Regions:
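Basic/polar N-terminal segments that are highly enriched at the extreme N-terminus
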Residues: 1-5
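Vicinal oxygen chelate
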Residues: 8-17, 48, 53, 58, 71-162, ...
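A low-complexity, Ser/Thr/Gly/Pro-enriched, surface-exposed linker/loop concept
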Residues: 64-69
Length: 163
């Protein structure tokens, strides 16, 4: 049986210094508000997510001490606010890990969690982070969402798009 390892471009990550200003700017461009604002407590980062029909955009900012803050701060110091990563989606991260390991790589699966500031709901996922040697210096990881969903936005309001 041939199982598809990667099923989607799950989301794009934009590293930002000032999350509130970035939210304001992207609301004007996209015509929608973020469906989720939260914090990765174990990483020391906070984010805002703009959900679309088949993917979402994550604005990611440092906030507390942690490995995520160190990583985002290094990206921001080098390039300023910018497209920082691509996240590939899978339905079976263990299969992806087995396949990658079978091809001579040793990858561990890590877990993540975030809490929505708006309603306290929790989302959980599993990740495999790809090294720069495989991703050609682009921050890429593979994700399988395991618990919770992003709220869908009602509809895009073209009156919010500012010229």
């Amino acid at each position: 049986m041939n199982i598809k390892m990667i099923s989607s471009v799950d989301h794009l990550i934009i590293a930002v210094r000032d999350l509130n200003q970035a939210i304001n700017d992207y609301e004007k461009v996209l015509g929608i508000s973020p469906c989720w604002k939260g914090k990765h407590t174990e990483l020391g980062t906070k984010n805002a997510l703009f959900n679309f029909e088949n993917t979402y955009l994550e604005l990611l900012s440092p906030c507390d001490a942690g490995p995520g803050t160190e990583f985002i701060n290094s990206l921001l110091a080098e390039k300023g606010d910018h497209l920082a990563g691509i996240v590939l989606g899978t339905q079976n991260i263990e299969h992806v890990q087995e396949d990658l390991n079978r091809n001579g790589h040793a990858f561990e699966i890590s877990s993540g969690e975030a809490i929505n500031e708006k309603d306290g709901k929790i989302r959980r996922w599993k990740n495999i982070f790809l090294p720069n040697t495989l991703s050609r210096e682009l921050f890429i990881f593979i994700i399988q969402h395991t618990e919770g969903n992003l709220p869908q936005h009602e509809s895009q309001d073209s009156s919010k798009v500012k010229k």
